[in-house]
């Protein structure tokens, strides 16, 4: 880009939040905009196409890695629809990126057991162009041959989940039937009957949950069910297999809470769950939730991966959670999740999982801030209900949080080592106008300087349900991090990174994504 265009971009970047605080239209990096905002296209996944084109003009390889990060179900954000729309756009522009398609269901290390996505992601990418289609058919054809060979040899545990995610040919959806037809015509199968026979055999061998439920067969080993299946069908399990399902959760709870030993390897899979998946039923259903459901949600919460385990030392993290009116915006088109549910779940996660002096403590804010403490011994239900009883109003007064924190610190003469090392602000970033009309970073740093304290690392965690909202900071602001999405993680990188852009490049150029090019 020319120097003139660069200058215009910077000069024309100023804006204000919906509540009047100075902010920015862009981070001044289109790839960073995609990295931090990609998830917010969940409401309108097609809208990500323009963002991908803009990012690709800046750095196409980094854009590719960013899309895989957004899709990554293990280390990234797990955004399925956004990835598919974005990847279709990128493959249309750069068909040579087809060489990375095999990594979607396989991961970059076949032995890692950590794919970026699922086999149906490949199916969703059909139709971009002939080149890409041929690559997809080739990948599926090869895996299908491997799976059938494993089935014939009786090596059931070596069969992939390909058959589960391929479309059925006898479904009621015309579009799905047409996709299935394209597949069997290009996979070397004779006809629809052959395709159905192959899928049936492989699905039966891999014990697909949905087939067993449709046959009213509840002889599950609940410890082996996929994370989304046990969450999605929990009411069916409670209704149709109540005694066994409840006994399973009772035993698991004793293991997780009391550390009791049991003969069987009892566990619950949570790899595919967001923290909000577990918190949302409590916020929405409230007092009518069953005791078994409370127990399951508590077990799932306790079993979520602890991303703080990778951090060195007992760093003092403090979560500041926005509970203002705009946080009740809903992501997606099917009432999937509200920003408030994302924020509360992430705030509680940070409060619970970090081991610093602010463990089990957090702040919520809207019109005025509320200091909240929870107890490890409480159930998830009790913790969420306790947080929900805090003061929630329409305002987004971030300044009030730092007025309260720093005034209290000065009056009590709190030593610097007992102040937060990193503050995680989880919000849609639509802050109220503040004193002297400064942007949020200027406001926060000014208050710390006036109080005589060093400003902590500031993590702005975007939980907005809307794409293209204003940004609180730009890419080069040292001592700050800009994150977005529903899944926690990467706390070691947060502490190490110097700026929003360096945080992103540390992740996208790291071992997990550097293989993509």
What are these model-predicted stretches?
Residues 1-342, 352-517:
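Long lumenal/extracellular ectodomains of secretory and single-pass membrane proteins
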């Amino acid at each position: 880009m020319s120097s003139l265009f660069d200058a215009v971009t910077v000069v024309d970047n100023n804006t204000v939040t919906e509540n009047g605080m100075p902010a920015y239209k862009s981070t001044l990096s289109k790839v960073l905009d995609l990295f931090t905002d990609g998830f917010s296209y969940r409401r309108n996944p097609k809208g990500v196409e323009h963002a991908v084109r803009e990012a690709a003009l800046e750095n196409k390889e980094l854009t590719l890695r960013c899309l895989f990060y957004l899709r990554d179900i293990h280390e990234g954000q797990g955004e399925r629809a956004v990835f598919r729309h974005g990847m279709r756009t990128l493959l249309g522009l750069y068909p040579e990126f087809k060489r990375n398609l095999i990594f979607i269901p396989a991961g970059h290390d076949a032995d890692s057991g950590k794919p970026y996505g699922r086999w149906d992601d490949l199916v969703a990418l059909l139709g971009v162009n002939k080149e890409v289609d041929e690559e997809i058919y080739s990948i599926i054809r090869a895996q299908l041959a491997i799976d059938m060979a494993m089935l014939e040899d009786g090596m059931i545990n070596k069969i992939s989940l390909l058959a589960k995610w391929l479309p059925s040919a006898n479904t009621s959806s015309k579009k799905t039937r047409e996709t299935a037809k394209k597949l069997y015509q290009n996979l070397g199968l004779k006809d629809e009957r052959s395709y159905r026979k192959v899928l049936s055999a492989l699905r039966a061998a891999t014990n697909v949950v949905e087939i067993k439920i449709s046959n009213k067969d509840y002889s599950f080993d609940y410890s082996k069910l996929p994370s989304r299946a046990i969450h999605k069908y929990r009411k069916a399990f409670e209704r149709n297999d109540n005694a066994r399902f409840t006994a399973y959760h009772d035993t698991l709870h004793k293991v997780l809470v009391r550390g009791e030993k049991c003969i069987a390897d009892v566990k619950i899979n949570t790899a595919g769950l967001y923290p909000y998946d577990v918190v949302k039923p409590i916020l929405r259903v409230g007092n009518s939730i069953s005791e078994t459901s409370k127990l399951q949600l508590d077990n799932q919460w306790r079993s979520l991966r602890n991303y703080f385990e990778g951090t060195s030392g007992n760093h003092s993290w403090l979560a500041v959670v926005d509970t203002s009116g705009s946080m009740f915006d809903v992501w997606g088109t099917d009432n999937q999740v509200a920003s408030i549910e994302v924020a509360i779940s992430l705030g509680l996660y940070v409060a619970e999982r970090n081991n610093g002096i602010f463990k089990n403590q957090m702040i919520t804010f809207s019109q005025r801030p509320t200091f909240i403490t929870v107890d490890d011994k409480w159930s998830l239900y009790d913790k969420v209900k306790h947080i929900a009883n805090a003061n929630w109003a329409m305002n987004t007064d971030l300044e009030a949080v730092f007025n309260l924190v720093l005034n209290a610190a000065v009056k009590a003469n709190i030593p610097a080592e007992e102040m937060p090392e990193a503050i995680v602000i989880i919000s849609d970033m639509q802050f109220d106008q503040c004193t002297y009309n400064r942007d949020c970073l200027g406001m926060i740093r000014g208050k710390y300087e006036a109080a005589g304290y060093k400003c902590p690392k500031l993590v702005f965690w975007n939980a907005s349900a809307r794409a293209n909202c204003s940004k609180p900071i730009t890419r080069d602001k040292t001592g700050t991090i800009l994150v977005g999405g529903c899944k926690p993680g990467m706390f070691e990188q947060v502490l190490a990174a110097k700026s929003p852009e360096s945080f992103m490049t540390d992740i996208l150029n790291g071992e997990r994504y550097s293989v993509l090019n």
